[in-house]
Amino acid sequence: MKLLLDSVVLIDHFNGIAAATSYLSAHRPDAAVSVITRAEVLTGFERRAARKAARFLDCFPTLGIDQATADLAAVLRRKHGWRLPDAFQAAIARLHGLRLVTRNSRDFQPQRHRFVVIPYRL
């Protein structure tokens, strides 16, 4: 595992964005999702489609939130002013030594946050 997928990349995939699908296909063996990502992605689907999306998400290891993650997320939120889900994503990535794969370059500027990967732009 080398990468933590942010929800925006998976949502792009489900919305038919070819760049997202190509990236996921090329990096699937190295990628994981967080419980935050899973919840954010599945929220966008109706029940039947959510089951299909969940099966796709099941292809990736799912990383949870523990006390150390919560503590680091609080520090990162104070320091950077991130929304709590973004702070949790960053904390999970950092504690597991993963790169955070996102399209959210507004909050996660790769030149400022070296653990961030912006795989494509729309």
Label the model's feature ranges.
Residues 39, 59-79:
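Acidic catalytic patch
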Residues 1-33, 42-58, 122:
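Short, well-structured N-terminal submotif of metal-dependent ribonuclease cores
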